Each structure stands twice: as structure tokens, then as C-alpha cells.
Amino acid sequence: MAAENISVIKLRNLLLVTVPPDPDDQTVSALQEQVLEAMARHGCGGLVLDISTVETLDSFFARTIAETVQMVQLMGGRTVLAGMRASVAVTATQLGLTLGKALTALDVDRAFDLLNSAPSEDSL
């Protein structure tokens, strides 16, 4: 899968990234790099990572997602994983995936609602 297929869209102060259905390791690495570059370039306050099309999760993908969540947090942003399928949730749990302070939402609309309504850690 070509890394050029990764879409990172800035909407107001947030980034929306839709993960391809079956990303290989190269695509997952490129996704992380593009997210971090966009966070730095735009100074965004949050990331919505739409994983609704993802059907399987391997250990590299799980680890990279967890690392990306942590890196976004270190850059001052918050992350919401949107649209996680039940099978992916089961696999993530079996792999011991911890998301730190990332939030989860059933879909992208709810993810944006969470980021727009939740207070930032700076104000807590």
C-alpha cells in the first residue's frame, strides 16, 4: 500500500486522519510521520484517528498507534481513536495495547464532539 494514500486533513484546530483498511508497516510508519509533521506545522490541538475501516491489528500497528498518541500528547495535543471495530478492540486488548490518555469514540462525529467539548489538560 502506498504511503501517498494517507490523508491528513486539518479542520479548524484539529487533524483528521483516516487509516487505510489494511495498512502495511511502511504505511503505518508514514502515517505516524505525517501526523507529527502536520501537528508541528499547523499547531493543532488534537487528532482524530479514524480506524473504522481497519479490520485487523498487528503488534507493529498497535505499538505505532500507542506511540503516536503519546507523541501527540507531548506536542500538546489530544487524540481520539474513532470507529474501532469489535474485532480490533479484542485484538488490541490481547496485544496489551494501552492508549495512555487517548479517548475513544464510536465514530468521527463523536470524536470531534469529544475534542471540542473536553477541557484541555492545561485547564485542569
Where are these regions (language model features)?
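A cross-taxonomic marker for long C-terminal extensions/tails that follow the last structured domain
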Residues: D109-L124
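Long, hydrophilic "mature protein body" segments
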Residues: A3-N5, A92, D107
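Amphipathic alpha-helical interaction surfaces in cytosolic regulatory modules
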Residues: H42-G45, L49-T98
